């Protein structure tokens, strides 16, 4: 049975995106009419109501022991066969194909960076949370720091946070909230979802990938930062140095999706070799 993760915002709903770019992408990913807009808004209303400091801490404890399943990375990729991410309603195919499409796009543009190819394959594996009963608003969608006031480029920022209890707490309702200026994103509590889960899982299992890879995984859905230009007050110099890598990854994450599905069988040996190199064996999930 396929699990629909529910709608993610497209470019046309992100307030920081160039209108011409949004228009061209909107012709392919239609979020401009029908019931989908209401569903997208509902997803973000739930997310922005319930993603609090307390919620994120509880989820980190719940999943932080990585005791749900023992399996290899390729087995996790295969699990994505059962995930159809409705963020792309015009192209109805499993998320596993998106993993290979992203990886192959990176491979063509950066043939000398095999670790980067692997990040393309890995980046959405955290969506297996949906198979463990997590609601869509706690799995997909744009991410943001909890514990401080949401910034202007957070999608639906002005209309979805009214019922979030943290914004009534003076510790969390200012621009910096519970953080120190330029504390570094490594010290920031991000909203819970597939990015944060996989980032923590990679650390737990000691993936031997460069730090750029960990940044790409953890922050590829952090659109208010890498595209909106917000949350710079929390960034360290290292974060700013890593930002171009996250932006480079984002191009392939967004723009490699198409109905021409890759021949996965022929690609598997190459990517299995990368898995064996950087994250081999049976891992804890």
Curated annotation (Swiss-Prot):
- Which reaction(s) does the protein catalyse, per the Swiss-Prot or TrEMBL entry? myo-inositol + O2 = D-glucuronate + H2O + H(+)
**Pathway(s) annotated for this protein in UniProt:** Polyol metabolism; myo-inositol degradation into D-glucuronate; D-glucuronate from myo-inositol: step 1/1
Which positions bind Fe cation 2? 124, 194, 220
Any idea which UniProt keywords this protein has? Cytoplasm, Iron, Metal-binding, Oxidoreductase, Phosphoprotein
Q: Where does Fe cation 1 bind?
A: 98, 123-124, 253
Pfam families, alphabetically? MIOX
Signal sequence: where?
Answer: none
Report if keyword Iron is assigned.
yes
E.C. number: 1.13.99.1
Q: Which SUPFAM superfamilies match?
A: HD-domain/PDEase-like (SSF109604)
Q: What is known about the tissue distribution of this protein?
A: Kidney specific.
Q: Which residues bind substrate?
A: 29, 85-87, 127, 141-142, 220-221
Judging by the UniProt lineage, the source's domain of life is Eukaryota
- GO CC terms, sorted: cytoplasm; inclusion body
Q: Bound how, and how many: what does the cofactor note say?
A: Binds 2 iron ions per subunit.
Sites where Phosphoserine occurs are at 33
The Gene Ontology biological process annotation of the record reads:
inositol catabolic process
Report the main location listed first in the record: cytoplasm
Q: Does the keyword Transport apply?
A: no
The family note in this entry says: Belongs to the myo-inositol oxygenase family.
State the protein's name. Inositol oxygenase
| Native organism | Rattus norvegicus
Organismal lineage: Eukaryota, Metazoa, Chordata, Craniata, Vertebrata
């Amino acid at each position: 049975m396929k699990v629909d993760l529910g709608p993610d915002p497209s470019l046309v709903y992100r307030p920081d995106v160039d209108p011409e770019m949004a228009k061209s992408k909107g012709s392919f990913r239609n979020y401009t009419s029908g019931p989908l807009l209401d569903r997208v808004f509902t997803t973000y209303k739930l997310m922005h109501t319930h993603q609090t400091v307390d919620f994120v801490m509880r989820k980190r404890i719940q999943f932080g022991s990585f005791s749900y399943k023992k399996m290899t990375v390729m087995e996790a990729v295969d699990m994505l066969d059962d995930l159809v991410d409705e963020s792309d309603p015009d192209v109805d195919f499993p998320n596993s194909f998106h993993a290979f499409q992203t990886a192959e796009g990176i491979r063509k543009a950066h043939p000398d960076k095999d670790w980067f190819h692997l990040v393309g394959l890995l980046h959405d594996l955290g969506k297996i949370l949906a198979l463990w009963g997590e609601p869509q608003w706690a799995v997909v969608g744009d991410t943001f720091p909890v514990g401080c006031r949401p910034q202007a480029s957070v999608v639906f920022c002005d209309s979805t946070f009214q019922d979030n209890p943290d914004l009534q707490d003076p510790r969390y309702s200012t621009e910096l909230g519970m953080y120190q200026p330029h504390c570094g994103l490594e010290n920031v509590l991000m909203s819970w979802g597939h990015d944060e889960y996989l980032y923590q899982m990679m650390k737990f299992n000691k993936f031997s990938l460069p730090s750029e890879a960990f940044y790409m995984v953890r922050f590829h859905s952090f659109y208010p930062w890498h595209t909106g230009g917000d949350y710079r007050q929390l960034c360290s110099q290292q974060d700013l140095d890593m930002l171009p890598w996250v932006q480079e990854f984002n191009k392939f994450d967004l723009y490699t999706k198409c109905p021409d599905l890759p021949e996965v069988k022929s690609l598997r040996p190459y990517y299995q070799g990368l898995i064996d190199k950087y994250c081999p064996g049976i891992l804890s999930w």
